[in-house]
Amino acid sequence: MVSEENWNSDTMSDSDMIDSKNDVCGGASSSSGSSISPRTPPNCARCRNHGLKITLKGHKRYCKFRYCTCEKCRLTADRQRVMALQTALRRAQAQDEQRALHMHEVPPANPAATTLLSHHHHVAAPAHVHAHHVHAHHAHGGHHSHHGHVLHHQQAAAAAAAAPSAPASHLGGSSTAASSIHGHAHAHHVHMAAAAAASVAQHQHQSHPHSHHHHHQNHHQHPHQQPATQTALRSPPHSDHGGSVGPATSSSGGGAPSSSNAAAATSSNGSSGGGGGGGGGSSGGGAGGGRSSGTSVITSADHHMTTVPTPAQSLEGSCDSSSPSPSSTSGAAILPISVSVNRKNGANVPLGQDVFLDYCQKLLEKFRYPWELMPLMYVILKDADANIEEASRRIEEARVEINRTVAQIYYNYYTPMALVNGAPMYLTYPSIEQGRYGAHFTHLPLTQICPPTPEPLALSRSPSSPSGPSAVHNQKPSRPGSSNGTVHSAASPTMVTTMATTSSTPTLSRRQRSRSATPTTPPPPPPAHSSSNGAYHHGHHLVSSTAAT
């Protein structure tokens, strides 16, 4: 992921932004560097990749495409990272030229340091040669970023036929030797540029498996050896690297880039996931043995330490906050821009705010919740580490648990209360609705879960007359009828009784047919308790309605 420091740093000059427009967009921008008229304020490169035109100033931190992973935005991020490193080096060099030394300060190193800075300044384009193996080192923690750079210069020194007993180093040797080394390095880069283009394109979307063996075995380095004659140079494959690096012990703390780290970071922009910097300051670590043409080339820790202090001090003094810090961006900087959601308890979730709110909106639509529950969805999604599947699962579990609890409370409270009231003619809510809704009756609104109310006495509890059959036939129509005979809720006992009446109609019709067939036979008298407010009829309704459900 491109770090926030890299993209938000104001380290790009006008010419760099123009180059970025020309290279990323694939054509000339609206304002060219050669035009006489003053150039317009730059627009956001990421928004321009998606067809928008928004002024860059004040917009960078709020751009909706900050974490976009499309091809254009990845190229833009790599180019901006390289430009930031170049600008940091230029500022450090300008400060070294203008700043007067104070007490307890030492001047920069001999002209070899200037040569090294200028090499890092203009080697950005041809430095793709070693991007493939530097990329592999970045993918495993970012601590091996200087390995490819050091190995390349060692190969250049070997090709220059340096004496085996006195090899030339970056800063320890004379300025003439350093200049010849860098000159050969440039020639080597130019010679290999065409061959490296295809390799860079192949490695642009994939991170290669790289076996880093004996990681912490070469802390005690041996004097390095170089062959007297070497006719062919080749970039070592991934399996040839066995480098190890000790823990970073640079005194800069903030991770000011060393010269070799900056070069490795600069050269790694050829891959789409190329990192923006090496590990922390590498003053305590030495590169392990790398193999070139079957010959062991091992760098000592003391040899590599000489390249660190001066560039680190100059960068630390000039670009403490504006320049990107390789130690803070190593490892993660080489990954493609992605929405990482693996943070604990939602802390620092690098999701865009619009994406996060869009997830909350999807949860609302899935569970059909009102808009007022948006803050609740936000809290649930944040607690679930911005994982919408996990948040949905938690909400579903909570809903099932609440439904189970409501059903348990109803059975423990309302059903015994209905039985104690002594009204067997009323059907309890679960008995009625379970046949219609199955086991999901608790999804109905809670307003329907309430104890039954008493029925008015005038509807069905008229005293029975001794006339027998006429009393029975006259009592039945006295109960209110319903057009469809459905039950609306347990809160309306009238509808419940209506369903009981309609369900018992076939029984009454059978009785009437039997009476019409034998008119001389009197009907059997009702039981003795039938005169007590019509309880016989209510009991009959209860049995028939239960059977009907």
Swiss-Prot record:
Amino acid composition bias (Basic residues), ranges on this chain: 129-152, 205-223
Polar residues biased stretches: 307-320, 472-487
Residue span of region Disordered: 1-42, 129-331, 452-549
Record key words, sorted: Differentiation, DNA-binding, Metal-binding, Nucleus, Sexual differentiation, Transcription, Transcription regulation, Zinc
GO biological process: axon midline choice point recognition; courtship behavior; female analia development; female sex differentiation; female somatic sex determination; genital disc development; imaginal disc-derived female genitalia development; imaginal disc-derived male genitalia development
Effect of residue 59 to Y: Abolishes DNA-binding
Biased composition (Gly residues): 271-292
Subcellular location field: Nucleus
GO cellular component: nucleus
Low complexity: compositionally biased ranges: 26-37, 153-182, 192-204, 246-270, 321-330, 456-471, 489-507
GO-annotated molecular function: DNA-binding transcription activator activity, RNA polymerase II-specific; DNA-binding transcription factor activity, RNA polymerase II-specific; DNA-binding transcription repressor activity, RNA polymerase II-specific; protein homodimerization activity; RNA polymerase II cis-regulatory region sequence-specific DNA binding; RNA polymerase II transcription regulatory region sequence-specific DNA binding; zinc ion binding
Tree of life domain: Eukaryota
DNA-binding region in chain numbering: 44-91
Disulfide linkage: none
Further facts: Experimentally shown to bind zinc.
Function comment: Controls somatic sexual differentiation. Binds directly and specifically to the FBE (fat body enhancer) of the yolk protein 1 and 2 genes (Yp1 and Yp2). This enhancer is sufficient to direct the female-specific transcription characteristic of the Yp genes in adult fat bodies. Involved in regulation of male-specific expression of takeout in brain-associated fat body.
Listed name of the protein: Protein doublesex
